[in-house]
C-alpha cells in the first residue's frame, strides 16, 4: 500500500479512497501534493484490484482551495513556457481510465477545478461551495473555468469567474445546474460516495465500465459523429461481438438488483 506526505490512501472491496490531507492549508496543493497526485494515478493504472476511486479531502472547511500560493514554484524565464503546476494532477491528465467520484466537502476553489473537471461525477456535502477567486487577486481566470465549461452553462461559469471572491455557489445551486449530481449531509458524504463506488466496482466486466467512460468522454470533447465512430472501436475492445451476445442472453439468469431511487 503506497504512503504519501500530503495524501491519505486506502483501498478495500475494489474501491480506493484518495484524501487530500493538508487541512491546515485548506487542502491547497503544493509541489509535493502535485507530485503525489501524479504518483497515485500512476500506481492505480497498474492496480487491477481497484475498480473505482473516491477523491475527497480531510476536514470540513475545504475540499481544496487550489494552488498553495505560499509554496515555491519554479518558472522558466520565457512567458511562452509558463509551467502550470497543477495542470496535470487529475486522473485523465494521467491517462487513468477507471471511474473517479469526487466527494466534495466545504470550499472548492480555483485550482480545485483541475481535479473536479476530470472526475466522472461529483457528490457534495450540503456545506460545499464553489468559486474562482482569480480576478479578485488581479489574475485572469482562464484554465480552471475552461474545465468548468465542460460541466456548467456558459453564464454560470462567467458569473463565477467574474465575481471572484464576491460570491460562492452553494451545493444546492451546483446541483441545480448539473455540476453536482447529489447533495447530502456532511456526515453522509463518504458513505454515499462509497455506495456508488462499490456499486460500480461490482459490475461483472471491468472493460465494460472503462469503454463506457471512454465513449462518453470522447463524445464530450468531439463531434457526435466522431464519437459514434469511436464507439464501435470501444465496443470491440471491450469484447468480441459473440461474447457480448452471449452476455445479453444471460441477463435473465443474473441476480436481481434492487435499485436505489435517487
Describe each model-derived feature in a short phrase.
Residues 1-56, 60:
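Conserved CoA-thioester-binding segment of acyl-CoA-metabolizing enzymes
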Residues 18, 55, 68, 115-117, ...:
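Hydrophobic/aromatic residues within transmembrane alpha-helices
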Residues 21, 67, 105:
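Histidine-centered beta-alpha loop that forms part of the nucleotide-sugar donor binding/catalytic region
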Residues 60-64, 109, 131, 216-219:
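Short, active-site-adjacent cap segments at secondary-structure transitions
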Residues 94-204:
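Crotonase-fold acyl-CoA enzyme core
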Amino acid at each position: 500500500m503506497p504512503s504519501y506526505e500530503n495524501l491519505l490512501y486506502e483501498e478495500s472491496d475494489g474501491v480506493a479512497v484518495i484524501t487530500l490531507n493538508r487541512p491546515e492549508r485548506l487542502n491547497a496543493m503544493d509541489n509535493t501534493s502535485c507530485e503525489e497526485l501524479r504518483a497515485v494515478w500512476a500506481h492505480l493504472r497498474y492496480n487491477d484490484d481497484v475498480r473505482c476511486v473516491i477523491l475527497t479531502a480531510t476536514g470540513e472547511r475545504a475540499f481544496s482551495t487550489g494552488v498553495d500560493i505560499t509554496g515555491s514554484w519554479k518558472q522558466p524565464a520565457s512567458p511562452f513556457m509558463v509551467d502550470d503546476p497543477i495542470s496535470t494532477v487529475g486522473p485523465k491528465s494521467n491517462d487513468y481510465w477507471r471511474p473517479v467520484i469526487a466527494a466534495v466537502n466545504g470550499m472548492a476553489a480555483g485550482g480545485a477545478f483541475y481535479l473536479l473537471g476530470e472526475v466522472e461525477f461529483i457528490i457534495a456535502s450540503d456545506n460545499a461551495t464553489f468559486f474562482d477567486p482569480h480576478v479578485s487577486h488581479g489574475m485572469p481566470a482562464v484554465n480552471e473555468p475552461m474545465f468548468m465549461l465542460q460541466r456548467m452553462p456558459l453564464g454560470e461559469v462567467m458569473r463565477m469567474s467574474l465575481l471572484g471572491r464576491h460570491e460562492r455557489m452553494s451545493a444546492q445551486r451546483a446541483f441545480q445546474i448539473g455540476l453536482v449530481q447529489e447533495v447530502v449531509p456532511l456526515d453522509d458524504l463518504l458513505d454515499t460516495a462509497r455506495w456508488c463506488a462499490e456499486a460500480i466496482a461490482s459490475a461483472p466486466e471491468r472493460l465494460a465500465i472503462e469503454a463506457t467512460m471512454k465513449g462518453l468522454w470522447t463524445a464530450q470533447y468531439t463531434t457526435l459523429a466522431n464519437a459514434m465512430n469511436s464507439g464501435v472501436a470501444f465496443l470491440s475492445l471491450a469484447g468480441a461481438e459473440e461474447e457480448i451476445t452471449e452476455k445479453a442472453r444471460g441477463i435473465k439468469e443474473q441476480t436481481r438488483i434492487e435499485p436505489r431511487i435517487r
